[in-house]
UniProtKB/Swiss-Prot annotation:
Family to which this protein belongs: Belongs to the bacterial ribosomal protein bL35 family.
GO cellular component: cytosolic large ribosomal subunit
Pfam families the record matches: Ribosomal_L35p
Keyword tags: Ribonucleoprotein, Ribosomal protein
The keyword Lipid biosynthesis is assigned to this record: no
MF terms (GO), sorted A to Z: structural constituent of ribosome
Native source species: Acetivibrio thermocellus (strain ATCC 27405 / DSM 1237 / JCM 9322 / NBRC 103400 / NCIMB 10682 / NRRL B-4536 / VPI 7372)
PANTHER family given in the database record: 54S RIBOSOMAL PROTEIN BL35M, LARGE RIBOSOMAL SUBUNIT PROTEIN BL35M
Full protein name: Large ribosomal subunit protein bL35
Source organism, top-level taxon: Bacteria
Length: 65
């Protein structure tokens, strides 16, 4: 059986934790930042865990990570 190709954009955007959860960066942090508070921008710097509904799809896209 052939190997599954890894989805290129997904391998750059997602990491798997030791327990198998999918770690991702938060959105809304690239531009139009002047109207956002410092607290909001600081919290957007942190990573978060993807929802379980999305995680199952993401794991199929990055099978060897």
């Amino acid at each position: 059986m052939p190997k599954i190709k890894t989805h290129s954009s997904s391998k750059k955007r997602f990491k798997l934790t030791g327990t198998g959860k999918v770690k991702r960066a938060k959105a809304y942090k690239s531009h139009i930042l002047t109207k956002k508070t410092s607290k909001r921008k600081r919290n957007l710097r942190k990573s978060t865990i993807a929802s379980s509904a999305n995680a199952s799809v993401i794991k199929k896209l990055i099978p060897y990570k």
